[in-house]
Amino acid sequence: MTHPVVVGHSLGGVIALAMAARHGELVRAIVAVEAPFFPPQPLREAVMGFLDQIRGPGYRDAQRAFVSNALFLPTDETDLKQQIVERMARTPQHVMVPALANIFSWDHAAGAAACRVPALLVNAGDAPGSVARFRELCPHLLVGQTVGAGHFNQLIVPDQVNAMIERFLVTAIRPAAPI
């Protein structure tokens, strides 16, 4: 596979941007779904408090509580929510802590400024400050927002997310030159 469109959710979206910023010649485009770019200070503070909790012996309970309370809407499907919470709680502590810490420590501004490939950000909620900052640094950024789903919008309203990605691929990606 050459020049893939890299699609990532949450940390995966941050990784997609990092790939485009560092190795844009290898990436055709990126799609970041619910990636926490340019988080506002209250969110940063909440995550730092959560990081302190998951560094301790009760990390699985802290993780379950945070995911249950912060990443879902009241209307999100209960069974799916429980499956996600339990699967995420299986993540080993030595993986969970640095993964979350790195989402917020990576230089989003440098990554956005260096991104030269088509980029789509699909958010579940309104993040005007984050989107404005991203667009300031990456003017070609396209943004979509799902309706009626929380952080796991790709699982809760996949038709909305997939439709946005499909349209992005049709309109923003030029066909590859014949090999």
Task: Give the positions of each predicted feature.
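Short beta-strand segments
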Residues: 8, 34, 122-124
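Proline-centered loop/turn at the N-terminus of a beta-strand
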Residues: 5, 29, 118-120
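Flexible "cap/lid" loop of the alpha/beta hydrolase fold
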Residues: 17-22, 26-58
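Catalytic active-site module of serine/aspartate enzymes centered on a nucleophile-bearing elbow/loop
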Residues: 141-179
